[in-house]
Amino acid sequence: MKLLKTVPAIVMLAGGMFASLNAAADDSVFTVMDDPASAKKPFEGNLNAGYLAQSGNTKSSSLTADTTMTWYGHTTAWSLWGNASNTSSNDERSSEKYAAGGRSRFNLTDYDYLFGQASWLTDRYNGYRERDVLTAGYGRQFLNGPVHSFRFEFGPGVRYDKYTDNASETQPLGYASGAYAWQLTDNAKFTQGVSVFGAEDTTLNSESALNVAINEHFGLKVAYNVTWNSEPPESAPEHTDRRTTLSLGYSM
């Protein structure tokens, strides 16, 4: 059975687990191996969702959902993604984040490609009313086998930040990202993604995930996300944000 990487939305009662520390925004890493040369069908889409509720002496709830959709041409790939998460404790919201983005890839050769991507994020509990990022550049597909896949890309970009105190700034940045996938078995796949946005306040994002297929369409995903910000907003002074999730995924 082929395992597809799971990503946003089916409402799940199977359970989820979440752990986070307030800090930086922007913990999404694009880990889909979007090489059109290895695509087996013209479209791949995934949905993930997780929910955790606790009642009694302590009342809390956490919800997360994300989705990724990719369309393949002969030498091109187009992707859209989005994610949402929020946490409440004793009927008070303690975190709320929404993000969306798009990406295009054009293969120059079997190994070299050009890319462009744009993303939007709001994470007001971590000090960001809005964060918009636009990047473009060159990438290299070093591995693209049935067991191991690895790509690395880099390029210039620009970022617009609007903070919860209504201050804003626009600054150029340098972008670099690597994504690795290891097909452990027919039903299990490990992925690791790292991205760096270098500017006056540099952001580093990492996602480690294990996807286990239940059947052709459903699977479980365990993911650990870390985001580090060199200069977080004053309203959210922690430099590092960590989140662990267990979610049920649906592959289209």
Swiss-Prot record:
Disordered: region residues: 231-252
What InterPro entries does the record tag this protein with? DUF481
GO CC list = cell outer membrane
Could you tell me the keywords of this UniProt record? Signal
**Signal sequence interval, chain numbering:** 1-23
Q: What is this protein called?
A: Uncharacterized protein YdiY
Organism this protein belongs to: Escherichia coli (strain K12)
Instruction: From the UniProt record, report the name of the gene that encodes this protein.
Output: ydiY
